[in-house]
Amino acid sequence: MDSFYRYGETTPILSGEMHYARIPHQYWRHRLQMMKGMGLNTVATYVFWNLHEVEPGKWDFSGDKNLAEYIRIVGEEVMMVILRPGPYVCAEWEFGGYPWWLQNIPGMEIRRDNTEFLKYTKKYIDRLYQEVGPLQCTKGGPIIMVQCENEFGSYVSQRKDISFEEHRSYNAKIKGQLADAGFTVPLFTSDGSWLFEGGCVAGALPTANGESDIANLKKVVNQYHGGKGPYMVAEFYPGWLSHWGEPFPQVSASEIARQTEAYLQNDVSFNFYMVHGGTNFGFTSGANYDKKRDIQPDLTSYDYDAPISEAGWITPKYDSIRSVIQKYVKYPIPTPPAPIPVIEISSIKLERVVDALLLAQSIQPVNASTPLTFEQLNQGYGYVLYTRHFNQPISGILEIPGLRDYAVVYVDGEKIGVLNRNTRTYSMEIDIPFNATLQILVENMGRINYGSEIVYNTKGIISPVTVAGKEITGGWNMYRLPMDKCPVLTEFGDNVCRN
């Protein structure tokens, strides 16, 4: 069998990746109708574990997090769903979808055959099934496929310190947890075609990411799937991700249209990653690791140069793809919906402003002899203000090699300079006078979401701070500034800056 079938009929999967959490729920239906108007019949989405389990055992599937409602709307629009629950998702998403607090659990080692880790992945998968299990096509819903893990072959190639046997055991156990939870639709894996050996798992269809060579695609799928298909490119990239300080990547519409036609001519199903990127709201954007830059934070924008722009507008790429698809599909392609009207917002005057140093004065600090990480402070995101008072003057080179990730340095409220992991700037000259306070405001710019460095993802100041080669110990105060809610500025009285 070299094709996908539904209700006994050959049904090629023409899918687009669109993540519920990156789009306000009020726009979900409009964007899905845009996908239909492009000629697609399926939507793929990751599930973000850390979005839903914000604290151990505390679950949230409301509002923009209402995955089940998103899937129901897909069904109402007569489309199919490919669910990609991870538990690891990459996705340029904070920590690859893992909850930050996993790092606080004794004995925890993520993404491997570790008892503690698998205990928590099982809880996640079982809870997810409660939300979406009834929406499988085997129960009359739109979910047609579920992915096991995610690009695990890449991780196997990067973590050669872990035995191949353990990697295989872990991958099989994640598949087993999905099945045990009650997922009965076909399972699949997705990897680069040269990484199938590490990423494939028995009983799941192997699919390739970014594979443009159709002959090679069929060859490797046949090799790992009993000499048969169906054949699918689970991530077909019409654009690419964006990092801070780097040019916006662009892929030509004509190039994508040509490749789309090649897939359609050769009975290859595909999933555009992304068809509509949306926005990394709040502190959800992730980062890559790079030896030259140490960290490459992702942007708040997840436009991805996708066929549907971040704002939800049709692009030339959208039109090019639509023109190709309509030549090959048997079903009618509807007219794309009208764009959502753009409103004009008048100027907004900020009349009450409070800076972070003043805000910290309203917060009870945590005291320690050395700086504590975000995780030790039981904080996932935002900022931490580290302060240390000096009774004697000191000057020289301030060094914070364990900075994660960006710091503004003050002495008695006066800005001295900036340290930045992204530019590998970990030191600066400093002069701290008698009876002065060193203040270091540290920002978490997003936990690494890809590669072997994902296991080193604590934030804040994670190693000793030195001045003139001397470690500064004793008397550290940490002020937690998660920025998860707006401060009540009236509480600051006359100290609030007024414009």
Model-derived features with residue positions:
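An acidic-aromatic substrate-binding cleft motif
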Residues: 1-27, 33-42, 229-231, 481, ...
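Aromatic- and acidic-residue-enriched carbohydrate-binding clefts of CAZyme catalytic domains
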Residues: 9-11, 46-58, 63, 91-116, ...
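Aromatic- and glycine-enriched glycan-recognition loops and surfaces
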Residues: 19-37, 56-73, 169-170, 254, ...
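Feature marks short, surface-exposed loop/turn motifs that line or immediately flank catalytic pockets
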Residues: 22, 49-51, 89, 152, ...
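Aromatic-lined substrate-binding rim segments of carbohydrate-active enzymes
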Residues: 28-96, 100-101, 175-180
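Substrate-binding/catalytic cleft of secreted carbohydrate-active enzymes
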Residues: 72, 83, 87-120, 126-272
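Carbohydrate-binding surfaces of carbohydrate-active enzymes
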Residues: 118-132, 139-147, 153-154, 158, ...
